[in-house]
Amino acid sequence: MTAAQGNSNETLFSSYKMGRFDLSHRVVLAPMTRCRALNGVPNAALAEYYAQRTTPGGFLISEGTMVSPGSAGFPHVPGIYSDEQVEAWKQVVEAVHAKGGFIFCQLWHVGRASHAVYQPNGGSPISSTNKPISENRWRVLLPDGSHVKYPKPRALEASEIPRVVEDYCLSALNAIRAGFDGIEIHGAHGYLIDQFLKDGINDRTDQYGGSIANRCRFLKQVVEGVVSAIGASKVGVRVSPAIDHLDATDSDPLSLGLAVVGMLNKLQGVNGSKLAYLHVTQPRYHAYGQTESGRQGSDEEEAKLMKSLRMAYNGTFMSSGGFNKELGMQAVQQGDADLVSYGRLFIANPDLVSRFKIDGELNKYNRKTFYTQDPVVGYTDYPFLAPFSRL
């Protein structure tokens, strides 16, 4: 059965074999920054949060997790680059495994979407460019709760890039040490890898800029390095070719997306082993009329983008972005996605899978509590339809 044909017998609640992982359903916890890891170290609150959202055979992706001390752009986001962090993550992973779930760690470097307060010695954030994120729409959240404009970044020298690639590789190894089932490379949403991919940001004239192939080079090196470190079956990749978050615009999102897919397919062929999945965020033009930076779009443009990437990719395809139950069911039944990840709905509904199955009423999420440090309110206190049990 091809992706284009779909399978009307498959639903969000059908089992799925994602490489070496036997999943009991297609509903995935999307990676979401929550700012509860005080001083970058996971704690019992994170273990409770992820355990609440675990189902037997379910698949979870952790929040964006720092690969180095200077890779953060939010307060109190977890890291995976120190022994202390690795040990602290073990309680989170063990809580998920105790419920019968699988969990990948999302490896994250925000690049220019940072501030001196998050940088060692108060330095400038790094990027593909020295152009700052525009101040007309975007602000960076500081530890004191204030929002200020993004500073001018420092463009990485080509000679520095291998060290950044190594940060991803070491973090991947650390994630496996912590017990994670694998990792997801965050190449989306205007963060460091996306700052190389998008021609609206990347103004380099060396081997990392200009052509699409050059702009894909950094992602290619990260994927190659991480696959070499932990194996392809434990590696997922997330991209968002048509998402304009943090000024991450591209003149031809479809061609960029297809170039990334082609590069990943080629790597899989050379390696002889498939990646765990490709995770693509779609723009939802039909829901919002435009992407975050104001670029207009249409249903047809969105459908062409997602279907083209789905058909081109040789492996498990995961979609995210504004899905409800009905849209998720449609995506699976029509063959547009193997898996669907949910974000905000999962924040407010830790038992989202159960609610979807019985068409239960959904809790409303509270945006004001998305990025606080409270270990309970807006984090682990959303009600269940039935009492929660960790076992």
UniProtKB/Swiss-Prot annotation:
Effect of a null allele: Male sterility. Fertility can be restored by exogenous jasmonate but not by 12-oxophytodienoic acid. Large petals with altered vein patterning.
Ranges spanned by the short sequence motif Microbody targeting signal, renumbered to the chain: 389-391
Any GO molecular function: FMN binding
Catalytic activity: (1S,2S)-OPC-8 + NADP(+) = (9S,13S,15Z)-12-oxophyto-10,15-dienoate + NADPH + H(+)
Residues with N-acetylmethionine modification: M1
Post-translational modification N-acetylthreonine, affected residues: T2
Activity across pH: Optimum pH is 7-8. Active from pH 5.0 to 8.5.
A Pfam cross-reference name: Oxidored_FMN
EC number assigned by the record: 1.3.1.42
Binding site for FMN: P31, M32, T33, G64, Q106, R238, S320, G321, G322, G343, R344
Binding of substrate, residues: H186, R284
Annotated metabolic or biological route of this protein: Lipid metabolism; oxylipin biosynthesis
Keyword RNA-binding in record: no
Name this protein carries in UniProt: 12-oxophytodienoate reductase 3
Gene from which this protein is expressed: OPR3
